[in-house]
Amino acid sequence: MFSIINGLKNYNQQAIQAARYIGQGFLVTLDHMNRLPTTIQYPYEKLIPSERFRGRIHFEFDKCIACEVCVRVCPINLPVVDWELKKTIKKKQLKNYSIDFGVCIFCGNCVEYCPTNCLSMTEEYELSTYNRHELNYDQIALGRLPISIIEDSTIENIFNLTSLPKGKIEGHIYSRNITNIVN
């Protein structure tokens, strides 16, 4: 008789403990229902990268002095710099510049250490191709702005915006060269 009563007490305690566990799980579920989703519907919605995002490298051919600092600081010696020495002006003249983004680790060292700031990181992150040789960008492909920035009608160049009046020392509200205008 006592064993039956002890068994019922034990059963009741286990049932209460199971109900607590279910209740705790339900509270966690309710807590997560109030949060915003962390994923996006990628092809239809695009992630807006942060200002310091390290995407595809943009190269300005006219600024480059062929010093090869970018090659020396690159952990994998990736940028290929072809230059020739012009004896008349006693300076190097850049002939070709290329980066293979199939190998690049996007560390940003080349951009950080470039003395003439001819390299910069863009916000472009869609570099997928069917052929890996298409990821080898020469100076012409590196010099192009991302297509999304060029063709987007909601983006306006800073040159088209009004400038600050004279005597005002505060910074401009648009801190970047390319600004997203929201209507």
UniProtKB/Swiss-Prot annotation:
Q: Which InterPro entries match?
A: 4Fe4S_Fe-S-bd (IPR017896), 4Fe4S_Fe_S_CS (IPR017900), NADH_quinone_OxRdtase_chainI (IPR010226), NDHI (IPR004497)
Membrane topology of the entry: Peripheral membrane protein
Q: Record's Gene Ontology CC terms?
A: chloroplast thylakoid membrane
* Chief location of this protein within or outside the cell: plastid
Q: Which residues bind [4Fe-4S] cluster 2?
A: C74, C104, C107, C110
Q: Which Pfam families match?
A: Fer4_7
Q: Does the keyword Transit peptide apply?
A: no
Q: Where does [4Fe-4S] cluster 1 bind?
A: C64, C67, C70, C114
Major enzyme class: translocase
User: What are the residue boundaries of the 4Fe-4S ferredoxin-type domain, all occurrences included?
Assistant: 55-84, 95-124
| Annotated keywords | 4Fe-4S, Chloroplast, Iron, Iron-sulfur, Membrane, Metal-binding, NAD, NADP, Plastid, Plastoquinone, Quinone, Repeat, Thylakoid, Translocase
> PROSITE patterns under this entry?
4FE4S_FER_1 (PS00198), 4FE4S_FER_2 (PS51379)
Cofactor: bound how, per the entry note? Binds 2 [4Fe-4S] clusters per subunit.
Self-association state and partner proteins as the record states: NDH is composed of at least 16 different subunits, 5 of which are encoded in the nucleus.
Its recorded name reads: NAD(P)H-quinone oxidoreductase subunit I, chloroplastic
Q: What is the lineage of its organism?
A: Eukaryota, Viridiplantae, Streptophyta, Embryophyta, Marchantiophyta
Q: Gene symbol?
A: ndhI
